[in-house]
């Protein structure tokens, strides 16, 4: 996005980390060891669907709603870029042993499933059907 400042620009990643700034995400998300994103857009849904360990950077450019953040912390590896030591926290995750990261990732699965159900997939009701029914049953003024 024009004018967007990625938190990654101020971080020197470990040698084992390769940054792809504009990947073909629909394919590349399945071959990564970890995914790092910093915006809760449709990309979040794509990343979660891959079941690849996800590091989410909560930045001041696109802050999470506090209640969502609280649930996300239990679901993915969350780094709060509002904190002074956020770069250290990010480096801790990117330097983590792969097996250890996968083990922690799997422990978060029940919370992540709830998070996905609530915030990514949305309501279980068919809202569009409800709206159409409402429109069709309204009496003209």
Task: Give residue spans per PLM region.
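Short acidic alpha-helix that forms the nucleotide-activated donor recognition element
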Residues: 22-32
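Catalytic binding pocket for nucleotide-activated donors in carbohydrate/polymer assembly enzymes
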Residues: 4-16, 34, 39-123
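C-terminal alpha-helical cap of glycosyltransferases
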Residues: 116-141
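Amphipathic coiled-coil/heptad-repeat helices and related helical stalk/stem segments
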Residues: 20-22, 40, 127
């Amino acid at each position: 996005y024009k004018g967007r400042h990625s938190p990654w620009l101020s971080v020197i990643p470990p040698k084992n980390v390769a940054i792809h700034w504009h990947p073909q995400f629909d394919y590349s998300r399945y071959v990564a060891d970890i995914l790092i994103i910093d915006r809760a857009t449709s990309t979040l849904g794509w990343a979660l669907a891959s079941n690849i360990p996800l590091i989410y950077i909560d930045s001041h450019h696109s802050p999470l709603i506090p209640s969502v953040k609280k649930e996300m912390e239990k679901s993915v590896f969350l780094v709060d870029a509002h904190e002074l030591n956020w770069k250290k926290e990010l480096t801790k995750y990117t330097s983590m042993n792969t097996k250890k990261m996968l083990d922690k990732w799997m422990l978060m699965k029940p919370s992540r499933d709830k998070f996905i159900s609530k915030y990514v997939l949305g309501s279980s009701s068919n809202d569009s059907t409800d709206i159409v029914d409402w429109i069709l049953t309204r009496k003209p003024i």
